[in-house]
Amino acid sequence: MLLYTKELVIPRPRPGLLRFRNNPRGIKFREKLCNSFAHSNIHGMQHVFGEQHLWQRCLWLAIVLGAVITGFSLYTVLMHRHSEQLLVSLIETTQLPVYHIDFPAVAVCPWNHFNWQRAPSAFIRFLPRHPNAELRETFRQLLASMDIMNFSNFNRIRILTKRNLTGISYLKMTDLMNFMTYRCDELFVADSCVFDETPYDCCKLFVREQTVKGQCLVFNSMISENSRKKHLINQFYPHKLSTAGEDSGLKFTINASYSFMNNIDALTPFGMNLMIKEPRQWSNEMMYHLYPDTENFVAVHPLVTETSPNTYEMSPKKRRCYFDDEKNPTFQNTSLTYNRENCLVVCLHLVVWKTCQCSLPAFLPPIDGVPECGINDAQCLGNNSDIFTYVKMGDQEKYINDSRQGHFCDCPDNCNSRLYEMSLNVRKLDYPKNSTDQLIKAQVYYGQRVMTKIITKLKYTNIDLLANFGGIISLYIGASVMSFIELLFVLGKLMWGFIRDARIKLKEYTK
């Protein structure tokens, strides 16, 4: 009979409840972490937690940490490049039809503003009854000074300060200029105006407007009240044009006869300033001179520049331009559309107001509530003409040693603007035999049917940042969106287990 000892049999449990050894909670959490990442699809992590040997796990951990640090270092560089907000200008097209924009406004400004045939009527209209010889001579010198005056030569009117101005101190320059300046029918030859190969009455095409050169006759503008009325009754105003070349745009002829126009004592010959500007632009410093007995051909090559809306979050100072719905602090209390030229004239008018405590609506956009400069203000205007006629821009003093006086205007461009490149060809005008006329002929037309459009936009957008971030993470970590979702799921699962164990432990502790 075999004898079984207690060493050969399975020990029987003691009576009562069985007791199991509790594993430490830290070990349990670590096991869950290892188990989760050992079966994870996140590159490298399965090796960190799944390899048998310690040195292999350390090696893979160093590789994973190095890849993560390198990837996020490059991402930091990428973020810095994105935060710089670099702008790039690209040619969007060179074949944009010219009818996409308005035909430019064309202003004709005489060198001598006044028709001296109306001088006797001006004496009767503006002087008191029975003026003495001194007052008549003072008024005549005033007319002679204003005849050749524009905003760049106020010092000409300063000579009047040596005379007694008491008798004419009440006069307003605007009223006097409106009475004495040329009428449309006095300048243009009848039936000489043609636009888009269609004849027009010149006085229906051209309207009187104020510019920095004084009162001019302007075609296709939106500045004056009469011009804006045209837009209300004609949806196609300002005019557009689809053709190019000579005889396709605007043609007009000016009567340059001296018999009734010029002042006898004037030293300035008769001539015209031709100004090409945007329809909603007050004035333009770039002008051409039109001389009698010449035929002038002005070819306009427009260039359209636009700024992408993705730059809207940038500050105008960094963008260096303003959108239409943004306000420049120096461009206020005006109904003009914002562009650089309009900003400059508004800024200039504010300088005149602060310097001489009056305004000049005859040359600059009006300022509500500010009195108009009178004859008594001529000395202030003349003494400060060097300030008014020179504009200092930006930080030019860092680069230019300029001791001249002037005024400072911060006027960036409009983010969506146009630039007109022009070329002028002049030839001598041939008259019919025995003709005694003196004429100035001019044509303004597009040089080509198409134009170039340049668009400025951010070089690196949020989409570029996201795409480059995805490329860096894929290259160094081999991760994707699904990898991040899986990582968040694993961490969330572990966090939930940790919270649940903590709650159980808290309940056991409170019992």
Curated annotation (Swiss-Prot):
This is Pickpocket protein 19. It comes from Drosophila melanogaster (Fruit fly). It is a multi-pass membrane protein. GO terms for cellular component: membrane; plasma membrane; sodium channel complex. GO terms for biological process: detection of chemical stimulus involved in sensory perception of pain; detection of mechanical stimulus involved in sensory perception of pain; liquid clearance, open tracheal system; response to salt stress; salt aversion; sensory perception of salty taste; sodium ion transmembrane transport. It is found in: Membrane. The chain crosses the membrane at residues 59-79, 471-491. PANTHER family: AMILORIDE-SENSITIVE SODIUM CHANNEL-RELATED (PTHR11690), PICKPOCKET PROTEIN 19 (PTHR11690:SF300). Belongs to the amiloride-sensitive sodium channel (TC 1.A.6) family. Its main location: membrane. It comes from the Eukaryota. Pfam families: ASC. Part of a complex that plays a role in tracheal liquid clearance. In both larvae and adults, contributes to the behavioral response to salt. Probable role in sodium transport. Keywords: Ion channel, Ion transport, Membrane, Sodium, Sodium channel, Sodium transport, Transmembrane, Transmembrane helix, Transport. GO terms for molecular function: ligand-gated sodium channel activity; mechanosensitive monoatomic cation channel activity; pH-gated monoatomic ion channel activity; sodium channel activity. Signal peptide: none annotated. Expressed in the tracheal system. Expressed in the taste-sensing terminal organ of the larval head. In adults, expressed in hairs on the tibia, femur and wing margin, but not in hairs on the tarsi of the leg.
